[in-house]
């Protein structure tokens, strides 16, 4: 068991890095970062440079069912904060707030290097990023079993099979180009070379636990496939159980480029007239071929448990051990297999659809739909925003989003240019400060860019259909 826990920790910690997108960013088109959400977008300035460590860091974390106050809340009798696990808390109140299926997510990304420049009516960009994502989806039955035991399922089978786990950490090297092909249409394409660093997924997870009506026997049925990569060497015993986990003595730079992949981003912006424009993009459409330090583990079988009788062990000098016999029975009933076969992992693509209404040169209103696919499920969000550019050096955005089953997401973004530097910070959840107890998710993005040629870019855009 300790070896299994150690292996999970290695997988888990290997996947936590830096973060992804804020909805508010999409229409802050004075920032070079807009090309990460739509490759047809062209930054305001003729040239930009991203420095390692300061160009952009982003964090997105949350879930789709529970608010902060569902987990931590005030106990008036104790005059203190308690969790739902406190002895005075009603665990049923917590369970009743769960959906049949519940999602938890963490997105992280960091810009390592980037550069872009305008060439006539086109715009080139090159970026190096580290991206990570973690998703866990669990059924309500699993939470009920964990918190109340199997007494809630007497004579029934608890559904544990809708559990899924997905975690990915990779490097991304992208080369993008955006160009106006008609007076009112701009298109963009970004090609990405990917290098997988660590990965873990419950590819198939079918499991159920049956409890007899009198509670004196259990029957566990499993059909599970786990796939992952991590810089460890795993050995198993004759029954397929993990026997040993070893880390390599040294890791070279070449080890970071042994899991290659490829992806593309495609986008377009259409300017209907001086007041309306529309945009669409598909990003992260691709895959990674994992073939280095690959680990595949399957668990299949059915195991029945009726308890352990230790009464016969009293005064018995024999060498029989009931717990050892139980372990032997488990090994005989459940088949485990370990392999190192290569596998393809497809990224979770995202689709952005946007519309914009321009009141004038300095003010516009935007609508954005984002559809995100991951681990066999779909996450949908919508954003309305008001975007203003009161002076040349400042741009502001105020947004309202419906996301993760919550309707109280108010966001804001600020970009300030002090040539040759541009500073920015944004979030979709400043409402967290107003209603912290009702918060289900939070994201923030901030950084600094080096930019040049911004005034010239304005003159060029007056002759091209760039969204402002």
What are these regions (language model features)?
Residues 20-468:
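Subset of outer-membrane beta-barrel
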Residues 1-23, 355:
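Bacterial Sec-dependent N-terminal signal peptides
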């Amino acid at each position: 068991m300790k070896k299994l826990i150690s292996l999970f920790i290695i997988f888990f910690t290997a996947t936590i890095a830096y973060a992804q997108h804020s909805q508010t960013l999409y229409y802050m088109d004075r920032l070079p970062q807009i090309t990460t959400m739509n490759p047809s977008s062209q930054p305001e300035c003729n040239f930009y440079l991203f420095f390692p460590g300061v160009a952009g860091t982003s964090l997105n974390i949350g879930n789709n069912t529970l608010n902060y106050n569902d987990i931590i809340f005030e106990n008036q009798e104790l005059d203190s904060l308690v969790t739902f696990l406190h002895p005075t808390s009603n665990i049923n109140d917590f369970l009743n707030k769960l959906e049949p299926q519940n999602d938890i997510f963490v997105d992280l990304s960091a810009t390592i290097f980037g550069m872009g420049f305008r060439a006539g009516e086109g715009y080139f960009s090159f970026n190096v990023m580290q991206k990570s994502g973690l998703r866990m989806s669990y059924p309500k039955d699993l939470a009920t079993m964990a918190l109340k035991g199997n007494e809630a399922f007497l004579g029934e089978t608890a559904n544990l099979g809708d559990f899924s786990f997905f975690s990915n950490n990779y490097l991304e090297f992208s080369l993008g180009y955006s160009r106006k092909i008609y007076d009112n249409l701009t298109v963009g394409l970004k090609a990405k070379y990917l290098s997988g660093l660590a990965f873990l997924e419950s590819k198939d997870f079918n499991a159920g636990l049956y409890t007899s009506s009198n509670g004196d026997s259990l029957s566990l049925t499993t059909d599970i496939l786990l796939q992952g990569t991590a810089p460890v060497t795993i050995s198993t015993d004759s029954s397929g159980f993990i026997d040993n986990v070893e880390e390599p003595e040294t890791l070279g730079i070449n080890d970071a480029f042994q899991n290659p992949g490829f992806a593309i981003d495609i986008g377009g912006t259409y300017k209907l007239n001086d007041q309306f424009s529309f945009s669409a993009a598909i990003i992260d459409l691709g895959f990674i071929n994992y073939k280095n330090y690959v680990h595949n583990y399957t668990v299949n079988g059915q195991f029945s448990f009726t308890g352990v009788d230790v009464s016969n062990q009293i005064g018995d000098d024999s060498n029989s051990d009931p717990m050892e016999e139980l372990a032997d029975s488990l090994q005989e009933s459940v088949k485990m297999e370990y392999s190192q076969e290569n596998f393809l992992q497809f990224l979770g693509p995202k689709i952005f659809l946007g519309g914009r209404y321009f009141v004038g040169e300095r003010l516009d209103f935007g609508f954005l739909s984002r559809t995100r696919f991951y681990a066999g499920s779909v996450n949908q969000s919508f954003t309305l925003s008001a975007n203003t550019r009161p002076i040349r050096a400042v741009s502001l955005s105020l947004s309202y989003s419906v996301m993760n089953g919550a309707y109280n997401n108010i966001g804001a973004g600020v970009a300030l240019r002090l040539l040759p530097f541009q500073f920015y910070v944004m979030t979709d959840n400043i409402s967290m400060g107003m209603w912290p107890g009702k918060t289900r998710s939070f994201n923030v993005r901030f950084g600094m860019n080096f930019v040049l040629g911004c005034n010239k870019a304005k003159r060029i855009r007056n002759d091209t259909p760039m969204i402002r």
